[in-house]
Swiss-Prot record:
InterPro entries found in the cross-reference section: ATP_F1_dsu/esu_C_sf (IPR036794), ATP_synth_F1_dsu/esu (IPR001469), ATP_synth_F1_dsu/esu_N (IPR020546), ATP_synth_F1_esu_C (IPR020547), ATPsynth_dsu/esu_N (IPR036771)
PANTHER family xrefs: ATP SYNTHASE DELTA/EPSILON CHAIN (PTHR13822), ATP SYNTHASE EPSILON CHAIN, CHLOROPLASTIC (PTHR13822:SF10)
Transmembrane segments: none
UniProt keyword list: ATP synthesis, Cell inner membrane, Cell membrane, CF(1), Hydrogen ion transport, Ion transport, Membrane, Transport
The protein's name in its UniProt record: ATP synthase epsilon chain
CDD domains for this protein: F1-ATPase_delta
GO cellular component, as recorded: plasma membrane; proton-transporting ATP synthase complex
Subcellular location(s) of the protein: Cell inner membrane
Function per UniProt: Produces ATP from ADP in the presence of a proton gradient across the membrane.
Subunit comment: F-type ATPases have 2 components, CF(1) - the catalytic core - and CF(0) - the membrane proton channel. CF(1) has five subunits: alpha(3), beta(3), gamma(1), delta(1), epsilon(1). CF(0) has three main subunits: a, b and c.
Amino acid sequence: MNTIHVDVVSAEESIFTGQARFVALPGEVGELGIYPRHAPLITRIKPGSVRIEMADGSEEFVFVAGGLLEVQPHCVTVLSDTAIRGKDLDDEKANAAKAAAEEALKNAKSDLDLAKAQSELAVMAAQIAALRKFRQKK
């Protein structure tokens, strides 16, 4: 069976390393699906869920808050400032952070404050969506 080596790395640690049959994640211009022997590619990724289909058919989920993707024919590397394993996502923390971002959006006094709040809100909305996807697959 053909597999591809996958590394998902955050600023703090390696989140996932292993062999996979397929990887799906949110690219900047749409959803990306990567199989072994994919053409080389470097692109930015949006906040969302990385779905890794293992060789045995099981799935692993990782939330990334955006980042970079490098694809080589036999290797996929996902680099993100923030990456959280699906099983480690916390509903309460995500909802509290989303509420804080919404409040910051209302109280933004400058364009920079507004942009930061919008970015944080988008990341938290993506994290909550990733959490829902992960719970559906359980």
